[in-house]
Amino acid sequence: MYAIIATGGKQYKVSEGDIITIEKLGVEAGEKVTFDQVLVVGGDDLKVGDPTVAGATVEASVVKEGRAKKVIVYKYKRKTGYHKKNGHRQAFTQVKIEKING
């Protein structure tokens, strides 16, 4: 059985036991989270939402929170001496999918 969930402005295809990296939720490691925006529940019978499947949820537990590797942004304009260096680390949450209800 699989499901497609929407969280953090993105969509993820998940199955039970999967560990996925999503946008930061602000939840402690070990806590449970429930995703209510389930777009599709697949398996023996396919349920497609309009836009979400009524009554379907996905339960997960938080594995860890962290920050991704640093991405360097370097702006440069020739002949003017202008250059600017900037770094960014995106915060993320890793969750393990425990159960798909739907």
Curated annotation (Swiss-Prot):
The alphabetized UniProt keywords are: Ribonucleoprotein, Ribosomal protein, RNA-binding, rRNA-binding
Q: Where are the transmembrane segments?
A: none
Q: What's a single GO MF annotation on this record?
A: structural constituent of ribosome
| One GO term describing the cellular component | ribonucleoprotein complex
InterPro entries reported for this sequence: bL21-like, bL21-like_sf, Ribosomal_bL21, Ribosomal_bL21_CS
Gene Ontology annotations of biological process type? translation
Known SUPFAM superfamilies for this protein? Answer: L21p-like (SSF141091)
Query: Self-association or partners: how does it assemble?
Result: Part of the 50S ribosomal subunit. Contacts protein L20.
The record's family statement is: Belongs to the bacterial ribosomal protein bL21 family.
User: What's its job?
Assistant: This protein binds to 23S rRNA in the presence of protein L20.
- What's the protein here called? Large ribosomal subunit protein bL21
The source organism is: Agathobacter rectalis (strain ATCC 33656 / DSM 3377 / JCM 17463 / KCTC 5835 / VPI 0990) (Eubacterium rectale)
The taxonomic lineage of its organism, from the top, reads: Bacteria, Bacillati, Bacillota, Clostridia, Lachnospirales
Q: What gene codes for this chain?
A: rplU
